[in-house]
Amino acid sequence: GDDGLKAVKNLTIDGGTMNVSKSNEALEALNVSINNGTVTTHSTDDGVNASLDDALADQNAAPSITINGGTVKVYADADGLDSNGNLTITGGSTTVVGIGSGGMPQTPTVGQGWVQQNVTVKAQDRVKVTDSNDAEVVSLTAEQAATSLFVSTPQIMEGQTYTVTSGSATTSVVAGENAQGGFGPGPGGFGGPGSGGSSDL
């Protein structure tokens, strides 16, 4: 398959329900903005890709992915969220379940709290994130096998410890920190907050 939705410049989702059940890259544009609605994507490459189209090459445009609200679930065989510029998540619930064959995961430059963890997930495994009081932050049934999980919701507070449960395995993770063995800023790395350059999840 090819891309699910593609725009040269701006792709904005303000509401409704969208399900890209099969694609190469599910959502692709220079600037991808999700403000509300329910968005679920499946892709053999990047889930959401912000990149500079040849038609805009002479305009010095800056790619960006911005999620301000809604419920976003991304299943990707490469990068879940791939911005060749800024990646910002300020609201809503975003979950990325990925294989991690590309440069993932990489974290938002600014925005609300998030957790990221390397996991071993089989299709149909129950995956959930709970806080220190065992209150559920997010829960889903994985629609595909995965090796990386990223979750951002308003309930997640940076610096707090959360528990990621995938199948029968549980792991503790601190919000706002890359998983052990994850990629940080630096030459050849995929960058953390403030590192500039591209942002991959």
Model-derived features: positions:
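A composition-driven surface/loop motif
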Residues: G1-L201
